[in-house]
């Protein structure tokens, strides 16, 4: 079923978006198949009136018009629609308007005549209406009003799939009722005045099959104008629900079908001989249907008939002989309850499927027929005029359905849901659904509503509780079972932990192809042979990657081309390096790679925009390495790589073995790739860092820590990391922390040297250290750095 979101919100309007509303509807069991706008995207289209309309002097099929759009002057517009005429209210696209497809309206000349706008058809506005010519608006449409506002076109058509047991939702009222329940909102009740009988005409009813039709209502309405146009609001509501406007009588019955879910039918009173019979077909009877086809009736088919023969297939299809046409003056409205078993399968016997049969065979609210008749009468008198007779009803209380009363045990509810819901909450859910309910001795006794044919057994009530309570609100408890767990080393480092750390550092994970452009790869790794695919997807994807960097740089370029200047990406995956000694002649190595470019931090009013540098990426990598067992043994050793800037590149070494690289992409390569700004990358073997420190708990020292600061002068070539490592090694167990807090070059330091300011924290777990003991540690450190690096204390 397709319905208008705006129409439903007239009944109940929760404070949720369209997307959230669709999610709610789906979780209620009414699966949303699709959502589409009811009109195209356009602006600048207003209600106008054709004040003058004359033939174009140089074109037989064009007309020259003057249109009033509420401005200070009339607009000259050339129109080719055959229905364009004086006095017509139209949809006028004024200068500057933009129609679907980004079609812009400008002043122009057509065959020498000025045209300052465009009179639009439905199709030109992206509105799905089968109509020739331009839109004809009601004569009372206010001139100058925005068409989107006038027709309420900011709306969506939502299509849902219903299971056969939920026929109660085959209407706007039913869907609104469900939305109101889940949002704990009352549904706006439709208020209309029942039309009193103003004439004494009645219709005699001969109910011969009460078991198949326990309730049948007819009403005469005389002197109707079937040529009156259906109001635009009704046509629009029908259109958005997928029903085409035909004439006011048919439109009204279709409107009631959609609004209440009650199928109705209208007969031409002049073509019906009373009494109207409700009976089963007789052998040999035939009926010419409204579509012109002839049905050879079978004896199990319920009919509406008169003394002259069949008038309609009950609850399925009307007959042509009694149908309403343009000459009809008096009509008989029909509203009935047909038993589902009397209709089910009958339409398919004749190759038919109608909106009426679709509802009746699933079940229609048996209390709805009179309300639907009153509503249809009110609409008919409002639109077509006329005089209404009394509502004539024939019914059989014996054969009318009975509302089911079902009991629900607390133990059964808990066992089936695997979750305990408070008693008050369950009772409230039943009340919100419109059910009568009592609770005693851990049992709910529930009486369903007339519109809920599907509530028959205990499990039906459990389903109602679950879907209204919310399937997502029921904990997803895994079943208990005995499992054989695999061995897991405590020292194994989970890759997900590393990914989380990078995401926390404002990186995003990327997944790029293992196939790369050989030209780009040779630019980055000119001395590395690559595997070439014999049958590649394309020339640009014909080589296996020897590094993840080429793919990440492509991702950076992709983002920069889309106005993303700050890019921080990481990727994990295999690189494929040809190796005669490896299995199958290729070494597959799992690596972690990352790339950064742009500013170091996101734009912020309180922060200064600084570009990333080598140490930003190095710091992020060191943070990752701090999670690993060997992170403190990793060294960054200056080394040149083909793809990297010779002055900003280093090899990553663990215990003297190279496990990766880090640095800035070479400027010439950045230029050839089209990258903007400096780009920094690293790549490291995962297996080399895939172990973590196993936590060893120890008591925190309660004795004071002593800090000593040293300013050591060393040669420029001495790495600070090696100096710090030497300090830690020489200081022994009492030296608990070493930190580099300043680097200085300038006055007081000889050229070619630098001053490294280092803090040493000395502490013992068993006693307060004396000055002599502290000085001994400091002396050992000074002696070690003197011997290894010829370090001197700065004056």
Curated annotation (Swiss-Prot):
Reactions mediated catalytically: tRNA(Phe) + L-phenylalanine + ATP = L-phenylalanyl-tRNA(Phe) + AMP + diphosphate + H(+)
Give the binding site residues for Mg(2+): 454, 460, 463-464
Q: Where are its TM segments located?
A: none
GO CC, any one term: phenylalanine-tRNA ligase complex
Which E.C. number(s) belong to this protein? 6.1.1.20
What's the superkingdom here? Bacteria
Kindly list the biological process annotations in GO that this record carries. phenylalanyl-tRNA aminoacylation
**Limits of the B5 domain:** 401-476
Keywords assigned by UniProt? Aminoacyl-tRNA synthetase, ATP-binding, Cytoplasm, Ligase, Magnesium, Metal-binding, Nucleotide-binding, Protein biosynthesis, RNA-binding, tRNA-binding
Residue limits of the tRNA-binding domain?
39-148
> Which prosthetic group or cofactor does it need?
Mg(2+)
Q: Which residues form the FDX-ACB domain?
A: 701-794
The entry's free-text remark on the cofactor is: Binds 2 magnesium ions per tetramer.
Q: Name one GO molecular function term.
A: tRNA binding
Q: Which NCBIfam families match?
A: pheT_bact, YtpR
Q: How does it assemble?
A: Tetramer of two alpha and two beta subunits.
Q: What is this protein called?
A: Phenylalanine--tRNA ligase beta subunit
Which species is this UniProt entry from?
Haemophilus influenzae (strain ATCC 51907 / DSM 11121 / KW20 / Rd)
Q: Which gene encodes it?
A: pheT
């Amino acid at each position: 079923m397709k319905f208008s979101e705006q129409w439903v919100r007239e009944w109940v309007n929760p404070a949720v978006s369209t997307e959230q509303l669709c999610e709610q509807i789906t979780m209620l069991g009414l699966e949303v198949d699709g959502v589409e706008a009811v009109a195209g995207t356009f602006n600048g289209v207003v209600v106008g009136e054709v004040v003058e309309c004359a033939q174009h002097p140089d074109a037989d099929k064009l007309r020259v018009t003057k249109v009033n759009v509420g401005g200070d002057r009339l607009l000259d517009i050339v129109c080719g629609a055959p229905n364009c005429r004086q006095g017509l209210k139209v949809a006028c696209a004024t200068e500057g308007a933009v129609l679907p497809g980004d079609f812009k309206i400008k002043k122009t000349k057509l065959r020498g005549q000025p045209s300052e706008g465009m009179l639009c058809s439905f199709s030109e506005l992206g509105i799905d209406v089968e109509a020739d010519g331009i839109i004809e608006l009601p004569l009372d449409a206010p001139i100058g009003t925005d068409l989107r506002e006038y027709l309420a076109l900011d709306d969506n058509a939502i299509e849902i799939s219903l299971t056969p047991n939920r026929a109660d939702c085959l209407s706007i009222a039913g869907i609104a009722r469900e939305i109101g329940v889940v949002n704990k909102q009352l549904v706006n009740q439709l208020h209309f005045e029942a039309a009193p009988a103003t004439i004494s005409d009645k219709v005699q009813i001969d109910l011969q099959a009460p078991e198949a039709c326990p309730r049948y209502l007819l009403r005469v309405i005389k002197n109707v104008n079937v040529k009156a146009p259906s109001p635009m609001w009704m046509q629009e509501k029908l259109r958005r629900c997928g029903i085409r406007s035909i004439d006011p009588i048919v439109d009204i019955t279709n409107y009631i079908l959609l609004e209440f879910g009650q199928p109705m039918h209208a007969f031409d009173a002049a073509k019906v001989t009373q009494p109207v019979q409700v009976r089963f077909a007789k052998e040999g009877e035939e009926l010419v249907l409204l579509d012109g086809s002839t049905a050879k009736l079978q004896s199990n088919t319920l009919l509406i008939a008169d003394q002259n023969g069949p008038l309609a297939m009950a609850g399925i299809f009307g007959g042509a002989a009694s149908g309403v046409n343009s000459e009809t003056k008096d009509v008989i409205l029909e509203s009935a309850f047909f038993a589902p078993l009397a209709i089910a399968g009958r339409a398919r016997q004749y190759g038919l499927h109608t909106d009426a049969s679709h509802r009746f065979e699933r079940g229609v609210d048996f209390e709805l027929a009179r309300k639907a008749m009153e509503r249809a009468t009110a609409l008919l008198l409002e639109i077509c005029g006329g005089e209404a007779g009394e509502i004539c009803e024939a019914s059989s209380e014996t054969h009318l359905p009975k509302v089911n009363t079902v009991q629900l045990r607390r133990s059964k509810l808990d066992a089936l849901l695997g979750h305990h819901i408070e008693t008050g909450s369950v009772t409230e859910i039943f009340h919100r659904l419109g059910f009568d309910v009592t609770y005693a001795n851990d049992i709910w006794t529930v009486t369903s509503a007339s519109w809920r044919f599907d509530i028959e057994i205990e499990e039906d009530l459990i389903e109602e509780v679950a879907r209204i309570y919310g399937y997502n609100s029921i904990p997803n408890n895994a079943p208990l079972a005995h499992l054989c767990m695999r061995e897991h080393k405590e020292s194994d480092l989970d890759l997900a932990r590393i990914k989380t750390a990078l995401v926390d550092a404002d990186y995003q994970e990327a997944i790029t192809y293992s196939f790369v452009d050989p030209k780009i790869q040779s630019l980055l790794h000119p001395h590395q042979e690559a595997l070439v695919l014999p049958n590649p997807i394309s020339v640009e994807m014909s080589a296996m990657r020897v590094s993840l960097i080429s793919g990440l740089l492509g991702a950076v370029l992709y983002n920069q081309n889309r106005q993303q200047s700050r890019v921080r990406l990481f990727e994990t995956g295999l690189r494929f390096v040809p190796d005669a000694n490896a299995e199958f002649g290729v070494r597959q190595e799992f690596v972690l790679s990352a790339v950064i470019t742009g500013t170091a931090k996101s734009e912020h009013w309180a922060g200064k925009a600084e570009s990333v540098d080598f140490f930003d990426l190095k710091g992020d990598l060191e943070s990752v390495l701090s999670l690993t067992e060997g992170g403190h043994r990793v060294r960054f050793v200056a080394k040149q790589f083909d793809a990297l800037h010779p002055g900003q590149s280093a090899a990553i070494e663990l215990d003297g073995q190279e496990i990766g690289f880090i640095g800035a992409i070479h400027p010439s390569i950045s230029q050839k790739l089209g990258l903007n700004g400096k780009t920094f990358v690293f790549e490291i073997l995962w297996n080399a860092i895939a172990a973590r420190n196993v936590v060893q708990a120890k008591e925190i020292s309660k004795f004071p820590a002593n800090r000593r600061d040293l300013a050591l002068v060393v040669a420029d070539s001495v790495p600070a990391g090696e100096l710090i490592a030497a300090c830690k090694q020489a200081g022994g167990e009492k030296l608990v922390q070493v930190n580099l807090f300043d680097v200085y070059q300038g006055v007081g330091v000889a050229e070619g040297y630098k001053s490294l300011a280092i803090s040493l924290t000395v502490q013992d777990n068993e006693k307060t250290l004396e000055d002599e003991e502290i000085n001994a540690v400091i002396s050992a450190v000074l002696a070690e750095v003197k011997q290894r690096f010829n370090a001197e204390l700065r004056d």
